A protein has these predicted regions:
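NAD(P)+-binding Rossmann beta1-loop-alpha1 motif at the extreme N-terminus of oxidoreductases
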Residues: 1-44
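ATP-dependent carboxylate/acyl-activation modules
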Residues: 5-8, 15-18, 22, 249, ...
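Internal alpha-helical scaffold of NAD(P)-dependent oxidoreductase catalytic cores
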Residues: 22, 116-128, 139-231, 255-259
Length: 269
């Protein structure tokens, strides 16, 4: 396939590199406003993958004007605060192509109905939502070794397109968790909320343990030994969850408030 990737998020870099590694011709536009020939992340594995794929000729990094807009797949992966940029880009594409073809994927976390707002800019129903679940400390593995991939689709035809695109990474039917786009958007925010509650609880336990002279590490091990809980995200502290974690929590809290539901737990987070 020929794939366009727009945006400079860690998800954009991971997808651009991995798609190229699996033989797709990938055209990556990190910044549609100015030309950027290189993109550097704090994750050296991602940087190395990108460099290798550029040298192999499967990954091309360039400006918007250099991208062929008749490619098979178009991925939009912008930061949560860059929605206006994404919408402006789609306006620009619409001016060039009135009836776009191919698959359009929103990987950006713009909150509920974010994908719908992008969809309104282009005259096509072939939109999917691929939640950004890339972990900063495990960028490549968090995608390639995921047990299941959440995909938001509103049409069966798009479901087939997404399976074809992701088959190198997810070969079995049970690995796909398809749901309506709006459900997938809310699920993405809910995941961030659940992680925040878990780490917040551990922070509280750490404070109590310190007061009582208890080793929090022993408590963590005990919690991890219970298979209902598991070992993930049991370390007290901050700095986890990905690039847009804080924004996700705020968006989730605002969404709950906007529909008139009071959640003391979300407010505490």
């Amino acid at each position: 396939m020929k794939i366009n990737v727009f945006g400079a998020t860690l998800q954009a870099g991971v997808l651009a590199g991995l798609f190229a590694e699996h033989g797709h011709q990938v055209f990556w536009c990190p910044n549609e406003l100015v030309r950027e020939d290189q993109v550097h992340y704090q994750n050296e594995d991602v940087n190395r993958l990108i460099e290798q794929q550029v040298l192999s000729g499967f990954l091309h990094i360039g400006s918007f004007d250099e991208l062929p807009l008749d490619n098979d797949v178009h991925v939009f992966s912008y930061a949560a605060t860059e929605q206006d940029r994404a919408l402006a880009l789609l306006d620009r594409i619409h001016q060039i192509i009135d009836k776009p073809k191919g698959l359009f994927i929103n990987g950006s976390t713009f909150g509920l109905h974010g994908t719908e707002q992008l969809k309104q800019k282009l005259n096509t129903e072939n939109w999917a939502y691929l939640p950004d679940v890339i972990q900063e400390g495990n960028a490549l593995g968090s995608f390639t070794y995921a047990k299941q991939v959440i995909v938001g689709v509103d049409h069966d035809a798009v479901k087939s397109m997404m399976q074809e695109l992701l088959r190198p990474f997810f070969q079995f039917q049970h690995q796909y968790l398809f749901m309506p786009i709006l459900d997938a958007e809310f699920t993405k925010l809910s995941i961030s909320g659940m992680l925040a509650m878990r780490i917040g609880y551990m922070n509280d336990l750490a404070l109590v343990s310190e007061k009582l002279g208890i080793d929090i590490f022993n408590v963590q091990q005990g919690l991890a030994a219970d298979n209902r809980i598991g070992s993930a995200y049991l370390s007290a502290g901050a700095g986890f969850g990905g690039e847009n974690f804080s924004h996700d929590i705020l968006t989730l809290s605002n969404t709950v408030s906007d529909i008139g539901v009071q959640s003391q737990l979300l407010e505490q987070i």
